[in-house]
Amino acid sequence: MSHHKKRVYPQAQVPYIASMPIVAEQQQSQQQIDQTAYAMGNLQLNNRANSFTQLAQNQQFPGSGKVVNQLYPVDLFTELPPPIRDLSLPPLPITISQDNIVTPSEYSNVPYQYVRSTLKAVPKTNSLLKKTKLPFAIVIRPYLHLQDSDNQVPLNTDGVIVRCRRCRSYMNPFVVFINQGRKWQCNICRFKNDVPFGFDQNLQGAPINRYERNEIKNSVVDYLAPVEYSVREPPPSVYVFLLDVSQNAVKNGLLATSARTILENIEFLPNHDGRTRIAIICVDHSLHYFYVPLDDDYEVSDEDDEESDGEEEDEDEEEEDVDNSETIQMFDIGDLDEPFLPMPSDELVVPLKYCKNNLETLLKKIPEIFQDTHSSKFALGPALKAASNLIKSTGGKVEVISSTLPNTGIGKLKKRSEQGILNTPKESSQLLSCKDSFYKTFTIECNKLQITVDMFLASEDYMDVATLSHLGRFSGGQTHFYPGFNATSLNDVTKFTRELSRHLSMDISMEAVMRVRCSTGLRATSFFGHFFNRSSDLCAFSTMPRDQSYLFGISIEDSLMAEYCYLQVSTLLTLNTGERRIRVMTLALPTSESAREVFASADQLAITDFMTQNAVTKALNSSMYSARDFITKSLEDILNAYKKEISMSNINSVTSLNLCANLRMLPLLMNGLSKHIALRPGVVPSDYRASALNRLETEPLHYLIKSIYPTVYSLHDMPDEVGLPDFEGKTVLPEPINATISLFERYGLYLIDNSAELFLWVGGDAVPELLIDVFNTDTISQIPVGKSELPLLNDSPFNERLRRIIGRIRENNDTITFQSLYIIRGPSINEPANLNSEKDMASLRLWVLSTLVEDKVLNCASYREYLQSMKTSINR
């Protein structure tokens, strides 16, 4: 417990400083850059050219009429330690002249959280783009939160959807009204269209101001789609749970844990229209279907009365129908080659609204039914085929929860031998490829039937994540991996249940398609994310989740003649409310003939996403070496291009490594990406590698950056206000420090956040007072280590502040991830040697050290060494 209001723990005496001195001229330049970075940190999304904050950062070139971002050159060696505050800054502003916006407002251009371009100034020609070696792509996230109600966008419900007759793009804030407002010119293809009747009227026929319409004022808008945008009636949301009931799942507690979690969250499944339906199939060497009758106490609602046209006798008949004594029934199907449905599908896929109580009863019974099982089989392939047959008329989500490698029936897998293959050129082809073609062909069928597959794999054994992840990759789903799961561990159970709960309660869209339309001369040519590429530019999602991100590569096929170019992302989908909607997001970007302007407007975080997606593709389709080589060569090309096009006149170009300030974090991120568990050299179990690659494919940008360059907080010396609520009630977080062990004091306390886990590093020589305040013990050997949680110490304000900080980091409404906390004791000269516990601690320490990516990690170069190798390479 704390013995006084505030302790002062030992403080570092010598701050971490750059290892190379900064001369006066460099200091002046550094001050300029820092001032700019500070201004950027306070920018609001505002496209008006006379915005004060933008004018503070941008410059206008004589005669151009355009406001562009300034280029600030820096020597990367004088930027050590790297200024990591840049990683949390918003992107460079996009400045669009008011003359090019129908109704200028801060919502005229799409917020970067929805669509973020790698370039804020687009080269007018492909040759200029090639010269800069910078990629042109957009990062897309159609929905920002797990629940749609957390962030609603303007909705048009009048049925007036104005589209260009030539390119089929939607009206947006950048069109031009001509001919006294009777026509409008498309900003994407320049075609002149008629303004439709009803555009200037409301639903009652009264005149309205067209300049107040949502699509004119907002770059992100939803439309309530009329019937012509649907090929059939909006289907209900359907969930089929495939539960592994083999010995493994029973012994490690996954079956009981998952059944209880589904039970506790069944009422939180999206059911806005009251039509959500559920089926449960248990799987071992057979398929076990369940017939779930209507609840005995179900009463007909007013809505049901209306459906029966208010006829009292119909109501009586309905009450008679539901007042029955039917019981839950289980049907065992042992024929895995030709599995058949034991009864009609509409009796196995039951309405949640009418069967909730009986579903809860079934979920309570399932662990009891299979508690004495002796079956070690798991027939996933036949179960998937059965599930698709069950919901082929509606589509929906198949939720697979398993602890066992599929080992019988179609899609049967065997453990792959990793010995002698890990960390060799054969690793990708022999360990990370899809082992059975069933998992590829089945996803094609899923897309035809509008079915998504999500995997929750929790086991202490090999699961062939590389193969099973194909199910989610091409159906709009996801694979979640819980290695070493055991329900006897409260921390394992907490992580699994939190993530499954968030996943089940997440809003979804069904029958979704996404397309990007570009200005003449531009075309989307590469597509990354979990979906099915149905045609050259149409991405199909059986269901669209809310926690994934996508990236589209853009090519310049013809010269761009206009001052601005446009990219419009449209998504057609069906909500759980039963509504068919269209979400339209329009991005306007200035064009440029200057390499200097293009470099000055490049977005280092979006570029990192582009590099990541391409590296993951190469890792899966070629080799780990080709993925790392792609990262290295891409960065070398950018540095070479900058040297040639921008800094050739600099007399210090041979002794320095120059880049613009807005890209100064890119080398650090590329170095970190090469050290990520998904891509780094060394022996990494294939399930871990495949899971990490799968996560990189879909991670929203801010989490992706954190997984590449983890956030590190120093806690023992945090200011008084940190860990306490601010004026908005949010817990104040410490300022991050650089991810390097050189900043760690032997007596310090540090928290590391890599977006997937949290690590609490306790210095081996931490003072007893600190240990008492955090763990209620003055002996470091007595603190909990490994996967754990901080103890609740009501008498310790410091302990409460730490728990608040951890809680704030875990408090996210845009991801299902719950970060487990690992407590690690740092080395000390007094610690015992050769104990098993110390060997375990050594592996934990190695794991933590691998997150400190500025250092030399597992034979990967430190950041300084990485820069030196880059300088040597481009000066050859």
From Swiss-Prot:
Subcellular location: Cytoplasm; Golgi apparatus membrane; Endoplasmic reticulum membrane
Main location: cytoplasm
Top-level lineage group: Eukaryota
CDD domains assigned to the protein according to its UniProt record, in alphabetical order: Sec24-like
Any one GO molecular function term: SNARE binding
Phosphoserine carried by residues: S51
Keyword Transferase: no
Positions of the UniProt region annotated as Zinc finger-like: 164-189
Biological processes per GO annotation: COPII-coated vesicle cargo loading; intracellular protein transport
Record's GO cellular component terms: COPII vesicle coat; endoplasmic reticulum exit site; endoplasmic reticulum membrane; Golgi membrane
Entry keywords, A to Z: Cytoplasm, Endoplasmic reticulum, ER-Golgi transport, Golgi apparatus, Membrane, Phosphoprotein, Protein transport, Transport
Region feature Disordered, mapped onto this chain: 300-326
InterPro entries (alphabetical): ADF-H/Gelsolin-like_dom_sf, Gelsolin-like_dom, Gelsolin-like_dom_sf, Sec23/24_helical_dom, Sec23/24_helical_dom_sf, Sec23/24_trunk_dom, Sec23_24_beta_S, SEC23_SEC24_subfamily
Subunit structure: COPII is composed of at least five proteins: the SEC23/24 complex, the SEC13/31 complex and SAR1. Interacts with GRH1.
Entries under PANTHER family matching the protein: SEC24-RELATED PROTEIN (PTHR13803), SECRETORY 24AB, ISOFORM A (PTHR13803:SF39)
Miscellaneous field: Present with 1720 molecules/cell in log phase SD medium.
Purpose: Component of the COPII coat, that covers ER-derived vesicles involved in transport from the endoplasmic reticulum to the Golgi apparatus. COPII acts in the cytoplasm to promote the transport of secretory, plasma membrane, and vacuolar proteins from the endoplasmic reticulum to the Golgi complex.
Protein name: SED5-binding protein 2
The organism of origin for this protein: Saccharomyces cerevisiae (strain ATCC 204508 / S288c)
Lineage, broadest ranks: Eukaryota, Fungi, Dikarya, Ascomycota, Saccharomycotina
Primary gene name: SFB2
